[in-house]
Amino acid sequence: MAFASPSLRLLPQSPLGRITSKLHRFSTAKLSLFSFHHDSSSSLAVRTPVSSFVVGAISGKSSTGTKSKSKTKRKPPPPPPVTTVAEEQHIAESETVNIAEDVTQLIGSTPMVYLNRVTDGCLADIAAKLESMEPCRSVKDRIGLSMINEAENSGAITPRKTVLVEPTTGNTGLGIAFVAAAKGYKLIVTMPASINIERRMLLRALGAEIVLTNPEKGLKGAVDKAKEIVLKTKNAYMFQQFDNTANTKIHFETTGPEIWEDTMGNVDIFVAGIGTGGTVTGTGGFLKMMNKDIKVVGVEPSERSVISGDNPGYLPGILDVKLLDEVFKVSNGEAIEMARRLALEEGLLVGISSGAAAVAAVSLAKRAENAGKLITVLFPSHGERYITTALFSSINREVQEMRY
């Protein structure tokens, strides 16, 4: 499987390709509106608008203001140049509008950027994959679309008929919610009552119905409640993201290839949060398929790990633990501190999970054995989703106390 290098990604259908093509045609057309005459007082050719000659011919004056001595009729303009079929096709493609059919077509192809100021002491380069720039600001936008499309293609769900039900801690629910809104589905999400208020507000803004569950039961409590709702609701359907292979598939088909292409295959280490297991398994699986020597590193919170530690969380069925070369445990405090630094020093407003992934990436980049390597780290969500959390608690107090 081969992918074009970044330098070859400019296509006629791309916005920049269309602009470049149109500018070229505009420049060519504009040049035809000018004629050139020689100024005896200068060695330069003076560009004079053709319109001036036309006015001169009508008024009997030339563009220099003198009487026109010629009474002969002007020769008709030459016929336009003959274009080949290929040229006409290129022009037609270049004039295609760059407008998505709906918001789902904006998902994916997120940019990558080097980290520069939080990398003191690093021996390897670190490039971040900004999933925070998805249309609904999270890597979960990809699986929201993937799971809905897979279910539609199998005939399991139908817009304006099926009621979608899904347990979530916020980001996956939002990824499903905005796609459901665009396609015409009703959505019910179950979530622990401990989830921050802005995620609830965003879900409601997108039309989702929210059912809160006992926070002490964690995500498992939300899963159990979702199953209960499905049994009681007509035409209800539950995606079961933790066991849904569409979760992994979309990252194998899109996220992995995007990283491979943007790095021109030079990635050495891939770092991502474990979460549902879909991102790290799908993306890591593709990268290892392309180069078996690429290391895949999973990141999990030390307070509630799913693989290691004394407080195991909910182990996703789609997580391929054997794919992981290493697992990093990062504390909530470390993740918050790094997320704040990313905003202040890199201009990247990202969430707590992104901070955790960055902590792991920086630690790896300081190892002697990784000197000169390229580490790619996935930032899964935007910082605006964490305004009322501990990430911005001090700023929240500061702005609340502001007076005019």
UniProtKB/Swiss-Prot annotation:
Q: Which GO terms describe its molecular function?
A: cysteine synthase activity
Instruction: Write the Enzyme Commission number(s) for this entry.
Output: 2.5.1.144
Q: Where does pyridoxal 5'-phosphate bind?
A: 171, 275-279, 353
Q: Region Disordered: which residues? A: 61-84
Q: Tell me the enzyme class.
A: transferase
Residue positions, PTM N6-(pyridoxal phosphate)lysine: 140
Cofactor(s) needed, names only, are: pyridoxal 5'-phosphate
Keywords, A to Z, come to:
Amino-acid biosynthesis, Chloroplast, Cysteine biosynthesis, Plastid, Pyridoxal phosphate, Thylakoid, Transferase, Transit peptide
Please list the GO biological process terms of this entry: cysteine biosynthetic process from serine; photosynthesis; photosynthetic acclimation; regulation of hydrogen peroxide metabolic process; regulation of superoxide metabolic process
Q: What does a knockout show?
A: No visible phenotype under normal growth condition. No visible phenotype under short day (SD) conditions. Reduced growth and pale green leaf phenotype under long day (LD) conditions.
Indicate the principal place this protein occupies in or around the cell. Answer: plastid
Reaction catalyzed? O-acetyl-L-serine + thiosulfate = S-sulfo-L-cysteine + acetate + H(+)
- State the family it belongs to: Belongs to the cysteine synthase/cystathionine beta-synthase family.
NCBIfam families (UniProt xref): cysK (TIGR01139), cysKM (TIGR01136)
Task: Give the multimer and partner information.
Answer: Homodimer.
The protein in question is named: S-sulfo-L-cysteine synthase (O-acetyl-L-serine-dependent), chloroplastic
- State the organism of origin: Arabidopsis thaliana
